Amino acid sequence: MSTESKCPFNHTAAGGTSNHDWWPNRLNLEVLHRHSALSDPMDAEFDYAQAFKQLDLAAVKRDLHALMTMSQDWWPADFGHYGGLFVRMAWHGAGTYRIADGRGGAGGGQQRFAPLNSWPDNGNLDKARRLLWPIKQKYGRNISWADLFILTGNVALESMGFKTFGYGGGRADTWEPDDVYWGSEKIWLELSGGPNSRYSGDRDLENPLAAVQMGLIYVNPEGPDGKPDPVAAARDIRDTFARMAMNDEETVALIAGGHTFGKTHGAGPASHVGAEPEAAGIEQQGLGWKSTYGSGKAGDAITSGLEVTWTSTPTQWSNDFFKHLFSYEWELTKSPAGAHQWVAKDAEAVIPDAFDPSKKHRPTMLTTDLSLRFDPAYEKISRRFYENPDEFADAFARAWFKLTHRDMGPRSRYLGPEVPAEELLWQDPIPAVDHPLIDDADAAALKAKILATGLTVAQLVSTAWASASTFRGSDKRGGANGARIRLAPQKDWAVNQPAALAAVLETLEGVQKAFNDAQTGGKKVSLADLIVLAGAAGVEQAAKQAGVAVTVPFAAGRMDASQEQTDVDAMAVLEPVADGFRNYLKAAYKTPAEALLVDKAQLLTLTAPEMTVLIGGLRVLGANAGGAQHGVFTDRPGTLSNDFFVNLLDMGTEWKPASAANDVFEGRDRASGQLKWTGTRVDLIFGSHSQLRALAEVYGSADANEKFVRDFVAAWNKVMNLDRFDLA
């Protein structure tokens, strides 16, 4: 018998076989319950925006400036200045952002949590965060970690002589890891071609991923799969940076600007490096990568395994990166750790050593640095920047600002005295309110006018949903404000039924014009407001037909953006590949439709109950794309009833697949075999999945219709106002 004591508690956080272990393909709803108030230690009334407004930002910056040259024995500063380390910290925090789903980025301070805190590409950034703790501790709740990371990157640049474009605060911290798909690989830095590879075909990177290997921010600095080919690496760079919304010019500016500072670390073999923070011993207190090579720090530090310093002034802004890139020929070599890198051929030793002032080194570069010279498009931009250093500085300042603010949403969310006055197209600008807004009486009169046009409940509801449901909680883009549903590209998306949409918008524009023309005091209603108001009118009418009197909340204040204020390419990524709320799939996908529904719900910041009640309501209101009848489990469409749930849960119906792909099903009378309904996976999951069925049973009960209506209205109102940051 074993003498090892067994823990008497078998239900602790230490483990046990989970549901996911037993049923790995089971639909995971946990993503809908992340970041709840239960995980937030701040008081319920805490308002981070108000707390930040009380911050003495200048004092924080003074402390950060002092920190830059306050080298600590436990992690000494390269060249006596932490600037390069902090630039990397901010870059890697923001650089996880990807345009496909808006996830990643600097918001929330996710670099504090797994997996990002333990990614190989984030090696030794744990030390950067610990260096910041005294400052975070000093200012407490008035500045979030997320804001502090980016501010520190800015101050690092400024302390090294660079003029930044600006800074906006407002990133509230999160308190647990995001649930983000970073890839299927089971091994850090796994090469392409493996069983879980993110690549297919001719090096086609899986969407929505924006990094070439698991655990990297963008590209492998040694080249694709570690092969030192600068031209091939350029393809990876262009692909990954484009997936983060950066064009070629911004890409060159970011790489060259960032690599003007600091160095990489590869003093010895990686075998000396210990476990990452999440796997390190408890006594290391959240630090990782403890190295046994020499002192394990300073000149003995090992991070990427590369040992490169790009410029002769690594703590000062300069044009040295391009000077060295074009002044030398480069030959392939290896770092002390054995990593592929390049050294200037027949060059003098002009690069200072990070810790020994008596030493000098020849200029060195990464494979991905040389891409800026040997890729024709990058080379043209690089030479222009080399010959026009002021243009380069401006391009880097703007690209850095975009990098570090891309996931913050509209400019109205930026806080602090350093927010730049210039409005930028990538911020999806919307005009400021410049006229008196409609009041409750106006709203009621307008709803009556809308209903009198003859537009159906389905038309009103589907148009409002199409407008508002573009919102992504990940990067705060999209939503009803701006009425971009009437502009390219949204007006032409297949899911929006362009011809039918145009007819609805034309009718609503007529109502808008009649109202605005009748006003004498300058009062106006925007089309953005009117679209949402029309949806409210449709919902109220449908609820009335179900015997429930309800008023959908409405707050005026949206404005209409112009086509000139809309970046068509940047807006195109908001087009849904799937919208289960409208029973829409753009194409056939490997990912099951029900999983895509949950993904959409998470982007809309919905809980599982909110997702459930919205599905049930939108089905009976006839909001399906193209008027499809799948999931319309009612004989009274246009009435806001709980029929979807009642009929889905009816044991008198037997369901069978009606397609080889198991994506459409027929529900027949169990006794007669007569066809009653058709449905998709998105419909049937609410009867199949045990947790969703439990929710469906609440709304399918005999006493549930009024609760169903009121819960639907609450969830509907939430979606309509997701982008109303002015109401928060």
From Swiss-Prot:
Q: Which GO terms describe its biological process?
A: cellular response to hydrogen peroxide; hydrogen peroxide catabolic process
> What binding partners and quaternary form does the record give?
Homodimer or homotetramer.
Cofactor, how bound (note): Binds 1 heme b (iron(II)-protoporphyrin IX) group per dimer.
As its record notes, the protein acts as a catalyst of:
H2O2 + AH2 = A + 2 H2O; 2 H2O2 = O2 + 2 H2O
| Residue(s) of cross-link: Tryptophyl-tyrosyl-methioninium (Tyr-Met) (with W-91) | 218-244
Q: Where does heme b bind?
A: 259
- Specify the protein name: Catalase-peroxidase 1
- EC class (word): oxidoreductase
Cofactors (names): heme b
**What superkingdom does the record give?**
Bacteria
Q: What is the lineage of its organism?
A: Bacteria, Pseudomonadati, Pseudomonadota, Betaproteobacteria, Burkholderiales
What EC number is given for this enzyme?
1.11.1.21
Annotated signal sequence is none
Enumerate the PROSITE patterns for this protein: PEROXIDASE_1 (PS00435), PEROXIDASE_2 (PS00436), PEROXIDASE_4 (PS50873)
Q: Where is the active site?
A: 92 (proton acceptor)
